[in-house]
Amino acid sequence: MVMTDPIADLLTRIRNANKARHPKVDMPSSKLKLEILKVMKQEGFIKDFSVNKDKFPKITVTLKYSDTNERVIKGLKRISKPGLRVYASIDNLPRVLNGLGVALVSTSKGILTDREARQQQIGGEVLAYVW
């Protein structure tokens, strides 16, 4: 089966596992997913991730919860979709919950947060919001 939107699949798997309070979630691997997960780990939304390099590579994401088993990820939303791409210039880069959340932006310098994109003065495709 061909996956038409791997980013939406990644976000949905994380959202569902997070709501069910699963400690880990597995998904098929891709370079784009690894870049997104790297940014999510830097921002503190996930604990860790690892790649299982079998015949069909899989990513195992370890989700992050507080000491009282409270979810760190409150929400995930896909913005730019295959049917409707959403691009933003430097001036129009979105702020998620007045800076409490993060917009994932695909730029010529890789996947960056909205803050990093503003610092580097580059716009790009707004992939998703994480808060």
UniProtKB/Swiss-Prot annotation:
- Protein's name in the database: Small ribosomal subunit protein uS8
Q: Per the record, GO CC terms?
A: ribonucleoprotein complex; ribosome
Query: What InterPro entries does the record point to?
Result: Ribosomal_uS8 (IPR000630), Ribosomal_uS8_CS (IPR047863), Ribosomal_uS8_sf (IPR035987)
Protein function: One of the primary rRNA binding proteins, it binds directly to 16S rRNA central domain where it helps coordinate assembly of the platform of the 30S subunit.
Q: Which organism is it from?
A: Acholeplasma laidlawii (strain PG-8A)
Q: Name one GO biological process term.
A: translation
GO MF term list: rRNA binding; structural constituent of ribosome
What protein family is recorded? Answer: Belongs to the universal ribosomal protein uS8 family.
- SUPFAM superfamilies for the chain: Ribosomal protein S8
Decide whether keyword Ribonucleoprotein is in the record: yes
Name of encoding gene: rpsH
The subunit structure is: Part of the 30S ribosomal subunit. Contacts proteins S5 and S12.
- Species lineage: Bacteria, Bacillati, Mycoplasmatota, Mollicutes, Acholeplasmatales
- Classify the source by domain of life: Bacteria
UniProtKB keywords:
Ribonucleoprotein, Ribosomal protein, RNA-binding, rRNA-binding
